[in-house]
């Protein structure tokens, strides 16, 4: 049986921390579905389509990684992909309590789908999409935080926001 994992997130935008987890997950699992959350209650900077395009660009060399969007329950999406695992990244102990609650709920919904946690590389332990957006908004250097294609997309977004 193939090992198939779903790696969910909003990825608004994708950071080197996200990419670290995706790349390492791609070494462990036969297939990894990067599932971009389409949540209409949030106000993301990038559209779902833009986030998916950025993710596809930065994972294009990973043959076993697929980028899709989903809405609704994660376990329903995982079932639709015949996934037996959910892959989550942890930055710090502070992430663990929230992730444990979500994992417990997912186990109630489908006990056949296991959640695997990977600690992010320590150099990205502080990193979040929110921090990246805040630094980029004020024209700070984000070259060590996101891939070049994401940096360029952020600069375009904030330049157009200023122009509007």
UniProtKB/Swiss-Prot annotation:
As for family, the record states: Belongs to the bacterial CoaD family.
GO BP annotations of the record are:
coenzyme A biosynthetic process
Where in or outside the cell is it found?
A: Cytoplasm
Q: Which UniProt keywords apply?
A: ATP-binding, Coenzyme A biosynthesis, Cytoplasm, Magnesium, Nucleotide-binding, Nucleotidyltransferase, Transferase
Q: Name one GO molecular function term.
A: pantetheine-phosphate adenylyltransferase activity
Per its record, how is this protein called by name? Phosphopantetheine adenylyltransferase
Domain of life, per UniProt, equals Bacteria
Q: Which Pfam families match?
A: CTP_transf_like
Which residues does the UniProt site feature Transition state stabilizer point to?
A: 18
**What Enzyme Commission number(s) does the record list for this chain?**
2.7.7.3
User: What GO CC terms are in its UniProt record?
Assistant: cytoplasm
Going by the record, the broad EC class of this enzyme is: transferase
Where substrate is bound, by residue? Answer: 10, 42, 74, 88
Q: How does it assemble?
A: Homohexamer.
Q: In which pathway does it act?
A: Cofactor biosynthesis; coenzyme A biosynthesis; CoA from (R)-pantothenate: step 4/5
For this protein, the record's InterPro entries field holds:
Cyt_trans-like, PPAT, Rossmann-like_a/b/a_fold
Report residues binding ATP.
10-11, 18, 89-91, 99, 124-130
Keyword RNA-binding (UniProt) = no
Provide the catalytic activity annotation: (R)-4'-phosphopantetheine + ATP + H(+) = 3'-dephospho-CoA + diphosphate
Q: Which gene encodes it?
A: coaD
Q: Does the keyword Plastid apply?
A: no
Q: What are its cofactors?
A: Mg(2+)
């Amino acid at each position: 049986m193939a090992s198939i994992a779903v790696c969910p997130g909003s990825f608004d935008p994708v950071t080197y921390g996200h990419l670290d987890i995706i790349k390492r997950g791609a070494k462990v699992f036969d297939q990894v579905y990067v599932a971009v959350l389409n949540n209409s209650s949030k106000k993301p900077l990038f559209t779902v389509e833009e986030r998916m395009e950025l993710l596809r660009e930065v994972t294009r060399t990973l043959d076993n990684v697929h980028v899709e969007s989903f809405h609704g329950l994660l376990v329903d999406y995982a079932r639709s992909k015949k996934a037996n695992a959910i892959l989550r990244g942890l930055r710090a102990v502070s992430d663990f309590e929230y992730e444990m609650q979500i994992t417990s709920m997912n186990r109630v919904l489908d006990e056949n789908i296991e959640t695997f946690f990977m600690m992010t590389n320590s150099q990205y332990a502080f990193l979040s999409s929110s921090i990246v957006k805040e630094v980029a908004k004020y024209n700070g250097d984000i070259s060590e935080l996101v891939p070049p294609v994401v940096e360029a997309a952020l600069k375009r977004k904030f330049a157009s926001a200023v122009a509007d």
